[in-house]
């Protein structure tokens, strides 16, 4: 959830965990809605997170717990392509594959950029799909991760997999839909000013 905390907060507000108006305080000084979810301060958060690589480890634990308790739920976790440079990710993947956790779905946002540059230049994790296959994952490659129909098809397929965890590798465009943000690493974690915000929203609304 850390990677997309703003999306998570929006979903929680929609479900009534806290007022939607509080979303306007995202990452403000003194706000309880910060860049990393904090279970002590945010209703609906099951675990605090921060460092890259923690998400998949927690997800593996949840998936194993579900198996041990004969619970039928599935566990989904989102990773960045830069995040999978962390060794902790592959320790968790190794365990998930060895324990045949078919209730686990790992989604990799493969946009090719991370906070300090091009992923391939920083420390290349490619080919991502082959690495997950080596750890006994069923792998689904999504050619356009910004296409909702392709994503839905991938999630539908993941629900049919038995005997092994699933990794959905999505090829995405960072900043998709905003001309001056697309494929620009400088917008990693950066907030637009009022003028940039107005332009971005106009472009997104025009695109539908």
What is the predicted function of each stretch?
Residues 1-5:
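Short, small-residue-biased leader/transition segments that mark boundaries at the very start
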Residues 7-18:
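Alpha-helical support elements that line or immediately flank enzyme active sites
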Residues 20-41, 72:
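Acidic-glycine-rich active-site phosphate/pyrophosphate-binding loop
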Residues 38-208:
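Glycine-rich ThDP/TPP pyrophosphate-binding loop and its adjacent helix/strand module
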């Amino acid at each position: 959830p850390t990677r997309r905390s703003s999306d998570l907060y929006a979903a929680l507000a929609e479900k009534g965990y806290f007022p939607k108006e509080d979303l306007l305080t995202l990452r403000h000084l003194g706000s309880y809605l910060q860049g990393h979810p904090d279970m002590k301060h945010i209703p609906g958060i099951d675990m605090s997170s921060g460092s890259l690589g923690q998400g998949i480890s927690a997800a593996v634990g949840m998936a194993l717990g579900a198996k041990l308790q004969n619970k039928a739920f599935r566990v989904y976790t989102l990773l960045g392509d830069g995040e999978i440079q962390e060794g902790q990710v592959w320790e968790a993947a190794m365990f998930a594959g060895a324990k045949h956790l078919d209730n686990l779905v790992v989604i990799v946002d493969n946009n090719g950029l991370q906070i300090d540059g091009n992923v391939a230049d920083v420390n290349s994790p490619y080919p991502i799909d082959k690495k997950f296959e080596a750890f006994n994952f069923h792998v689904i490659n999504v050619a356009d991760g910004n296409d909702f129909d392709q994503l839905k098809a991938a999630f539908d397929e993941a629900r049919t997999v038995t005997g092994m965890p699933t990794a959905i590798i999505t090829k995405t465009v960072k900043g998709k839909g905003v001309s001056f943000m697309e494929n620009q690493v400088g917008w990693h974690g950066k907030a637009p000013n009022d003028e940039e915000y107005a332009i971005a929203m106009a472009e997104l609304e025009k695109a539908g």
